[in-house]
């Protein structure tokens, strides 16, 4: 177990692996060899570094499950970034946080819609009352007999007060 955390041992294994790959593939025209070697080196280093890191994390922390989960997610996200992917793995806690945020936003929007609907209903009721007040009465219900020009039909004696209301009056003002 001590060899797993020994840096010299890890570096010697990486050097041995690189030397082995160089001897196997001695073709100078091999264009992808540096990329393959670097990927294998990164994978080996991650493998060798992750085990001691998790052991140290488990010893020092009380919440072992969350630490292991975080380490694994971080390792996979690093591998995805090395592979060129922009997506990331998210933990269940992050998904629950995002779901809570979405649900909270939906509740806020529903409350706003409810307020707007209530205001619209109040406005419709107000418009209905205004319309009821402005409705024009039908002609057959209005007594139009007093609206005709009665000056031609009645004489001075027939007027109620003895004067024709349509005649202009003389107005005198005191000076």
UniProtKB/Swiss-Prot annotation:
Annotated residues for binding of Ca(2+): 120, 123
Membrane topology note: Single-pass type III membrane protein
Cytoplasmic side: 52-175
SUPFAM superfamilies per record: Rotavirus nonstructural proteins
Keywords linked to the UniProt accession: Activation of host autophagy by virus, Calcium, Enterotoxin, Glycoprotein, Host endoplasmic reticulum, Host membrane, Host-virus interaction, Ion channel, Ion transport, Membrane, Metal-binding, Secreted, Signal-anchor, Toxin, Transmembrane, Transmembrane helix, Transport, Viral ion channel, Virulence
Gene Ontology CC annotations of this record: extracellular region; host caveola; host cell rough endoplasmic reticulum membrane; membrane
GO BP term, pick one: monoatomic ion transmembrane transport
List of glycosylated residues: 8, 18
Segments traversing the membrane: 29-51
UniProt cross-references to Pfam families, sorted A to Z: Rota_NSP4
Lumenal compartment segments: 1-28
Subcellular location(s) per record: Host rough endoplasmic reticulum membrane; Host membrane, Host caveola; Secreted
The record's account of how the chain is modified after translation: The N-glycosyl content is primarily Man(9)GlcNAc, with a small amount of Man(8)GlcNAc.
The organism's place on the tree of life at top rank: Viruses
InterPro entries in alphabetical order: Rotavirus_NSP4
A single GO molecular function term of this UniProt record: metal ion binding
Record note on quaternary structure: Homotetramer. Interacts with the immature particle in the viroplasm. Interacts with host CAV1, early and late in infection. Interacts with host integrin ITGA1/ITGB1 heterodimer. Interacts with host integrin ITGA2/ITGB1 heterodimer. Interaction with microtubules blocks trafficking to the Golgi apparatus.
HAMAP family linked to this entry: ROTA_NSP4
Record remark on domains: Binds 1 calcium ion per tetramer.
Protein role: Plays an essential role in the virus replication cycle by acting as a viroporin. Creates a pore in the host endoplasmic reticulum and as a consequence releases Ca(2+) in the cytoplasm of infected cell. In turn, high levels of cytoplasmic calcium trigger membrane trafficking and transport of viral ER-associated proteins to viroplasms, sites of viral genome replication and immature particle assembly. The secreted form acts as an enterotoxin that causes phospholipase C-dependent elevation of the intracellular calcium concentration in host intestinal mucosa cells. Increased concentration of intracellular calcium disrupts the cytoskeleton and the tight junctions, raising the paracellular permeability. Potentiates chloride ion secretion through a calcium ion-dependent signaling pathway, inducing age-dependent diarrhea.
Similarity comment: Belongs to the rotavirus NSP4 family.
Protein name listed in UniProt: Non-structural glycoprotein 4
């Amino acid at each position: 177990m001590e060899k797993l955390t020994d840096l010299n041992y890890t570096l010697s294994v990486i050097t041995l692996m690189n030397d082995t790959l160089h001897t196997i593939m001695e073709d100078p025209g091999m264009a992808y060899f540096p990329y393959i070697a670097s990927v294998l080196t990164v994978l080996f280093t991650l493998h060798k570094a992750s085990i001691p890191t998790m052991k140290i994390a488990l010893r020092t922390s009380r919440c072992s499950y969350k630490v292991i989960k975080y380490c694994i997610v971080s390792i996979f996200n690093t591998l995805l970034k090395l592979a060129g992917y922009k997506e990331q793995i998210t933990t269940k806690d992050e998904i629950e946080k995002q779901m809570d945020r979405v649900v909270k936003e939906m509740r806020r929007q529903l409350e706003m819609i409810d307020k707007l609907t209530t205001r619209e209903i109040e406005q419709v009721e107000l418009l209905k009352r205004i319309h009821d007040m402005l409705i024009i009465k039908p002609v057959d219900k209005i007594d139009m007999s007093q609206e005709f020009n009665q000056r031609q039909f009645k004489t001075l004696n027939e007027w109620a007060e003895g004067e024709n209301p349509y005649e202009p009056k003389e107005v005198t003002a005191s000076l």
